[in-house]
Amino acid sequence: MKIAYFDCAAGIAGDMCLGALLDCGVPLEYLNRQLQALGIEGEYGLQVSRVQRCGQPALQAVVEVLGSQSGGSLARHWAEIQALIAGSQLSPAIKARSLAVFEKLAQAEAKVHQMPVEEVHFHEVGAVDALVDIVGTCIGLDWLQVERVLSSPHPVGGGWVSTEHGKLAVPVPAVIELWEMGRVPVFSNGVEAELVTPTGAALAVALAEEFGPCPPMRVEKVGRGAGAQELPIPNVFRLWIGEANGGELTETVSVLQTQIDDLNPQVIAYTCEQLLALGAWDVFTQPITMKQGRPGILLTVICPPDRVPECQDLIFRETTTLGIRHFQQQRTLLERVVERVETPYGLVDIKVARHHGRIVNAQPEFRDCVARAQEFHVPVQTVWLAAQSAWQNRLQG
């Protein structure tokens, strides 16, 4: 599986992403040709140059707005952006990623300006440079065949910037909204400047599956995109491209644990159900012996890091616990796909796991087996065996 890791130690912006992708080998001619599908080629020019930031070489991509738009941003409503991208000849994958980024950006700007998303039509969402940066980044990721994006935490920066709405404190409101939307971990690197732009934040929030350390991977390429400012640190966004180790996938999970010895077991069962409904990946209990020999249970919840606050709130609300331990761990997953087979009882999904490209496990989806068994009034094991047989016949056929 091809992975892209956004290294945002000095920040992230749309033009920095574009520069890093070009530095990774995305052909400029290919990028320009793909961007022509938007029908805005007469509105901008894309200039690329090799520069240095604090002695580090990087590629700087600059979108120059041409003609009547050079004095300001092109105002387009969110619906126009949707139509422009959806109606283009770009691939479905590029369209989906581009629209996801613009949707996050529009939602953030709408919240900042207290207006419906449909009415958003100001500088960020309508600007030609944002279109080129966002769609161009998605084109580049597609060319590199990136299947999964992860990101480092974001630096908060500081100071003030001038905008159409006057001077704004850094980070600007739209970036803060995007960070809140994506539960992005942030830190201070001591630099007083705008380090994360709304476009850069939207790209990370929409495309990255999680924020944290670089995952285990075999590094194939590292692209460096230069920011426009000269800073006390190298103003460079680094894009790591590589293959997940052994075809496996490693991700960060949060683990919550608490011991309980004074709660109705029926409430514990209900709490487990609610935690799963809230987005926890797994919830289980173990019998333990607590102080003074009292029998109790250890409740363990495994969830995405961004679900920790909601899961903690639910545990405090529904149980008698006075404290919850939480920590992060890495888990390794096999590459998994779902395939569908035809049985005498209807369609059943098969969950297939691969290790180093070799199938190591294939199991019928039990819920499908139950549904087909109830529909045809046969034992669930009969449907399960029929699905396994259909899968084996496909492999041998």
Curated annotation (Swiss-Prot):
InterPro entries from the UniProt entry? Ni_insertion
Q: GO molecular function, one example?
A: lyase activity
Could you confirm whether the keyword Calcium appears in this record? Answer: no
Q: List the disulfide bonds.
A: none
**Looking at the Swiss-Prot or TrEMBL record, what is one Pfam family this protein matches?**
Ni_insertion
Kindly state which keywords UniProt assigns to this record, in alphabetical order.
Nickel
Q: Which family does it belong to?
A: Belongs to the LarC family.
Q: What name appears for this protein in its UniProt entry?
A: Putative nickel insertion protein
